[in-house]
Amino acid sequence: MKKNFWEGYVAPGRVFGNLYFVGTRPASTHVLATEEGLIVIDPGYPEALDTVLENMRAVGLDPMQTRIILCSHGHYDHAGAVLPLKELTGAKTYVGKGDFDMVAKGIRTWAEELGTEYHEAFTPDVLLEDGDHVTLGGADILCLSTPGHTAGTLSFFFDVSDGEKTYRAGMHGGVGLNTLNKKYMKDNGIPEEMRERFLAGIERLKGERVEIFLGNHVPNNDTAGKLAKVAAGDKDAFIRPEEWIPFLESRASALRDLIAKEEREAETVRIIAEEKIVMIVRGVPAEQMIPLAEAMYRGGVRVMECTYDATGKTPDTEIAATIGRLAKHFEGRMLIGAGTVIRPDQVDLTASVGGRFIVSPDTSTAVIKRTKALGLASLPGALTPSEATTAHRAGADFVKLFPISNMGASYLKAIRAPLSHIKFLAVGGVRLENMADYLAVGAAGFGIGVTDADKKALAEGNYAAIEEKCRAYVSLAKGNA
């Protein structure tokens, strides 16, 4: 379990007029006060319900006057506290129709990703559909279906008043992209069209007049900062009609960026799989890297790994600068990545200069996860079935079986028997004489290092020798020998 994921205090307060914020930093909860009772929007985590109740009392609201509990969507951080709040107050519960299985059956609630379990399943009193209205004591909340984050995500629009002025408040019910990445969608059987529905919802909501933009999460609209301004005397701090459209556009752009990142990542994985050869360059002076890479390119190499210096003699920044120069020089012709990556910050550095993949000597899940988060291909090192499985589950695209020379082709055959779904690269001691043996037992590719002989040829300007070597390896790997 992620330690106390529900904690994070935000001083409660009045948003404007009859609308209040009583939630926490991880989970926003708003309350609309009416003549006939309270409407609680997204009660949050069950673990934080006591805090929400205390916050309600702190702003002068009686939790026992809650008549309606309204959920923007069915995830644990929004609907987890519905059941205990309903049991306490007897309020009616409202959820988008598309999220019925989430709240009633505990399916895909995001509780598992937080390391906990969803025990608070409930059957909603009302299942809302697009265009429905939730009314109580003069309040009228328009509910618009905006699927994407979940199938049943609802966005809310309603008037708030201080008795003198009335403003239109609006909230998108779920803009997180954690459920719209390709892996999550594939693992959970979510159709890719959900992304298009998300974007369509964004466009639709641009047509809604919103003067008070409410955050479905605190950072969306700087809830905490605005509450502090209200507390300091600026009662109109939340009245920002200029914020709504830019926020929506930023979320649409974020999804398009995610799609582009995933497409680039998929292209990297495809090229590595097709080319089969990753040339590993270590200890070559920076000024010789481009001439060396050009010779490799002429020899048919399309994937090149530049290693960081584990001894620390050459600073990471210098090696990253070389990777950046190579990436720029060979854009569209050759993939450039980093090797001997042992820390997440090295992943960040590589990504910042245009590197396309990360090779590690070990199975560091922190490195793998950071690699995937940045849209790079992951090639960690492993030797045992347990290590290989750990790497694969963390998101590795290939697993580098290293050093393969210690084990031989028979070991690759044995490890692939139960793990045929993992793409193994044979690295360490691979020669022209034994490549066919590894290919015969299912090697997905190879890592081939630059040898002392290659460095000597480079120093002598004998690029033809380097080309010839590369051509021989590439030809054999692709079955053209």
Q: PLM features: residue spans?
A:
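Conserved beta-strand hairpin/beta-sheet module of binuclear metal-dependent hydrolase folds
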Residues: 5-59, 63, 155-177
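Metallo-beta-lactamase
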Residues: 8-9, 14-16, 38, 45-47, 65, 97-251, ...
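Active-site HxH/HxHxD metal-binding segment of metal-dependent hydrolases
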Residues: 19, 47-50, 56-133, 233, ...
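C-terminal alpha-helical cap/extension of soluble enzyme domains
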Residues: 218-221, 267, 290-291, 413, ...
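Conserved N-terminal beta1-alpha1 strand-loop-helix module at the mouth
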Residues: 265-336, 341-353, 373, 433, ...
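Hydrophobic faces of well-ordered beta-strands that scaffold small-molecule active sites
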Residues: 277-281, 304-306, 336-339, 358-359, ...
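Active-site-adjacent beta->alpha loops and helix N-cap segments on the catalytic face
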Residues: 286-288, 310-328, 344-348, 358-390, ...
